[in-house]
């Protein structure tokens, strides 16, 4: 599995497998090594192919097997791909619960990680808004920390895009409350502009009110001047 050619050979066998015999054999052989293989430069591709081809029962066993190491795997440059593929293939409430519980305490750390942020974004894109509440709670609670980060500002925008109305207001409220510091940040100012572009009149008015007393100062600053200009349009 860790050999480039061996890995390709096994992937080809999985593609050719019409009766699930090969899939069953590979599953039994690698399940106990799945954590290590997911982070391997070649093994991760076999894991991805297996997750695509295996049965729901086998997939649940894989999710159970990696759940304790999911954060560690997600931060790995190879492992992140295998975790994203796993999230794409999730089918049962139990699988979703296991993934959610595994990631719950590390949302902000993953968002700020070069590889881990893609796992959080995959959850946002793939899972239902109510299944992603743990992400919305984390980014709302750590709003400034998330929004002023290179990866975090992008994740916050995706959260807003895929949230329910209630979740959207939860996030927008935190952005509004922290607007004065966010508009002065190289990344945070883009998120405030993004919220303004949503065209929610009451939110735009509240944001403008929060910034009004600091208008001259903000107009002279590199990042916040962009937000002031948008407010005036």
Regions found by a protein language model. Give the residues of each.
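Eukaryotic gene-expression regulator signature that favors modular helical reader/repeat domains
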Residues: 1-233
């Amino acid at each position: 599995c860790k050999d480039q050619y061996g890995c390709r050979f096994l992937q080809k066998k999985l593609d050719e497998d019409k009766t699930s015999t090969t899939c069953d054999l590979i599953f039994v052989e690698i399940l106990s090594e799945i954590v290590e293989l997911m982070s391997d430069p070649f093994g991760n591709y076999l894991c991805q192919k297996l997750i695509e081809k295996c049965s729901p029962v086998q997939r649940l066993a894989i999710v159970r097997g990696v759940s304790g190491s999911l954060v560690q795997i997600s931060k790995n440059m190879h492992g992140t791909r295998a975790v994203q593929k796993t999230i794409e293939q999730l089918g049962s409430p139990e699988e979703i619960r296991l993934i959610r519980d595994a990631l719950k305490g590390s949302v902000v750390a993953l968002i700020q990680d070069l590889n881990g942020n893609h796992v959080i974004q995959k959850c946002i894109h793939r899972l239902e808004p109510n299944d992603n509440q743990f992400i919305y709670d984390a980014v709302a609670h750590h709003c400034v920390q998330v929004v002023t980060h290179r990866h975090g500002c992008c994740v916050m925008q995706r959260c807003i895009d895929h949230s329910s109305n209630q979740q959207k207001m939860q996030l927008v409220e935190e952005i509004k409350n922290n607007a004065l510091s966010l508009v002065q940040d190289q990344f945070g100012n883009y998120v405030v502009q993004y919220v303004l572009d949503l065209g929610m009149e009451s939110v735009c008015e509240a944001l403008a009110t929060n910034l009004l007393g600091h208008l001259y100062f903000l107009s002279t600053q590199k990042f916040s001047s962009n937000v002031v200009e948008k407010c005036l349009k």
